């Protein structure tokens, strides 16, 4: 059977007729020269010849095509020159000076000029090939699809494209175009590569959260997040992690190791991501930009917090009074008005506050400096807002107006407290008896009743 096939090919070569459609063999796509032609090639062309022949050989092996004669490949791998090249393909110049490829046996030729990439080339067996210089799509089993220009290295050293380049590009393109469907059916080719051949992008979707990945390995790595498996355990505190890298980062908390150092200010960090975030302070980089107003932020969390201003969304709701807030920290601060929690203590006088900002404002009292002075009465203030609020007393200006009753106020706080009369809102609740109030001072006064009752009860018990 094999002898018959080889005999048929030899007959086709001698007659110059095209082979019937069937399985492609290595000699169908081999680029061959006579001994004289081989000697006329410069070292760069010979190196290109070896690369092209070996690449075509690998492509055919991948396709599972029978390769009966491997002697020429063996010589090429050893970088030895082929002994006798039976087929003859000449690169000659025609009458008008343009280069062309000519088969000695058949007499067929094709002009290789500026428009050669748009003309068909026929080799000595009659195979029609599309000649062009675009990058070729090649495939190898078990590896990703990659782009490879068969003559990239050669073109880097030559200013013009040689006829040999045009032939090699054409043959390889022919393999891909003709055997595209065979590639799709090839059992060892991964699904994403088959999809690429069809001209489609292949995607792996996580069934848990719908996130999409182009590579299966990325999906597998991502899915660890959803699994309960956390094989990496900290021997100090017992905390477990899904990845070893997370355990390594966590371990630095116990060791105090901070291997990442800022070259600007010498500050050290236990994570590279923290260092990168810190360095934006020095560079002024603000990569996270708001599409609505153009304001930029150093961190993504800053942008997320800012975006709520544009949407008007207030997702954080107080379970006590039903009031909504844009930010979680605002809700946390508000909830202390119901619980009477005051975690911030002044080290000077021991007074406690529910908010850090209140403590900061209070601590100014202990400092002697009051740089903001009223020109009318000489009263001085620690901060400019205090002076501005004070000046309204002298001017009589009351810029804050109630939309319900048109009453005006000198401070926004007074307006806010007043508006609760119209809304009926009473956000301040006594934990002892459940009574509610519309202003915090009213609640404070009320609590003294319970404090007095407790004192009286204590005296009676004594």
Curated annotation (Swiss-Prot):
Chief location of this protein within or outside the cell: nucleus
Glycyl lysine isopeptide (Lys-Gly) (interchain with G-Cter in SUMO2) crosslink residues: 119, 122, 194
Family annotation (InterPro entries): KRAB, KRAB_dom_sf, Znf_C2H2_sf, Znf_C2H2_type
GO-annotated molecular function: DNA-binding transcription factor activity, RNA polymerase II-specific; RNA polymerase II cis-regulatory region sequence-specific DNA binding; zinc ion binding
Domain KRAB: 24-95
Subcellular location: Nucleus
Record bears the keyword S-adenosyl-L-methionine: no
CC terms in the record's Gene Ontology section: nucleus
UniProt entry keywords in alphabetical sequence: DNA-binding, Isopeptide bond, Metal-binding, Nucleus, Repeat, Transcription, Transcription regulation, Ubl conjugation, Zinc, Zinc-finger
Zinc finger residue extent: C2H2-type: 204-226, 232-254, 260-282, 288-310, 316-338, 344-366, 372-394, 400-422, 428-450
GO biological process, alphabetically ordered: regulation of transcription by RNA polymerase II
Domain of life: Eukaryota
SUPFAM superfamilies: beta-beta-alpha zinc fingers (SSF57667), KRAB domain (Kruppel-associated box) (SSF109640)
PANTHER family: C2H2-TYPE DOMAIN-CONTAINING PROTEIN-RELATED, KRUEPPEL-LIKE TRANSCRIPTION FACTOR
Family from the record: Belongs to the krueppel C2H2-type zinc-finger protein family.
Biological function: May be involved in transcriptional regulation.
Protein name: Zinc finger protein 610
